[in-house]
């Protein structure tokens, strides 16, 4: 029996040593969307201009800034996401009159953004015109 035990154990050992190679699946051709772009390929995002004006804030964001610390103190063990959820619940509960305060702040911030954006766009336009005029003067030399 000892000889059969040895042969039985050696066969199980040899099975353990054999590595199974993973089956490679053939690569799928990328799907082409209606616009002719290949799906799955990421397009490169152009970098944000650091001089561009910051976008205006919504009424809820102004509300969140005011109430986040209060909720965080009353729920110290909550995660950032849970606090955000609680803020959303509080925002839904407050009256329309209370929301008007934050809507007014948001409207003022939007006016600020529109003015800054207008100035920023004009600045970009003058820069591009200056560059194009300097390019044309270089060609005439």
From Swiss-Prot:
Gene Ontology CC terms, in alphabetical order: chromosome; nucleus
Pfam family, one: HMG_box
Annotated keywords: Chromosome, DNA damage, DNA repair, DNA-binding, Nucleus, Transcription, Transcription regulation
Matches recorded under InterPro entries: HMG_box_dom (IPR009071), HMG_box_dom_sf (IPR036910), HMGB (IPR050342)
Domain of life: Eukaryota
Keyword DNA-binding recorded: yes
Predominant location: nucleus
Record region (Disordered): 1-56, 117-141
GO molecular function: chromatin binding; DNA binding
Gene3D superfamilies, per database record: High mobility group box domain (1.10.30.10)
Biased composition (Basic residues): 17-46
Biological processes per GO annotation: chromatin organization; DNA repair
Biased composition (Low complexity): 1-12
UniProt keyword Acyltransferase present: no
Known DNA-binding region: 53-121
Location(s), subcellular: Nucleus; Chromosome
Function: DNA-binding protein that induces severe bending of DNA. Required for DNA-binding by the FACT complex, a general chromatin factor that acts to reorganize nucleosomes. The FACT complex is involved in multiple processes that require DNA as a template such as mRNA elongation, DNA replication and DNA repair.
Subunit note: Probably associates with the stable spt16-ssrp1 heterodimer to form the FACT complex.
Family, per entry: Belongs to the NHP6 family.
Protein name, as recorded: Non-histone chromosomal protein 6 homolog
Organism: Dictyostelium discoideum (Social amoeba)
Record lineage: Eukaryota, Amoebozoa, Evosea, Eumycetozoa, Dictyostelia
């Amino acid at each position: 029996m000892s000889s059969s035990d040895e042969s039985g154990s050696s066969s199980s050992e040899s099975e353990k040593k054999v590595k199974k190679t993973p089956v490679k699946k053939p690569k799928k051709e990328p799907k082409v969307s209606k616009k002719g772009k290949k799906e799955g390929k990421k397009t490169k995002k152009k970098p944000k201009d650091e001089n561009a004006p910051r976008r205006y804030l919504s009424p809820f964001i102004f509300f969140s800034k005011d109430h986040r610390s209060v909720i965080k103190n009353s729920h110290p063990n909550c995660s950032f996401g849970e606090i955000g959820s609680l803020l959303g619940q509080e925002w839904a509960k407050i009256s329309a009159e209370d929301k008007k305060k934050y809507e007014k702040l948001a409207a003022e911030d939007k006016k600020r953004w529109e003015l800054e954006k207008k100035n920023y766009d004009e600045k970009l336009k003058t820069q591009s015109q200056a560059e194009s005029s300097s390019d044309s003067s270089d060609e005439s030399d």
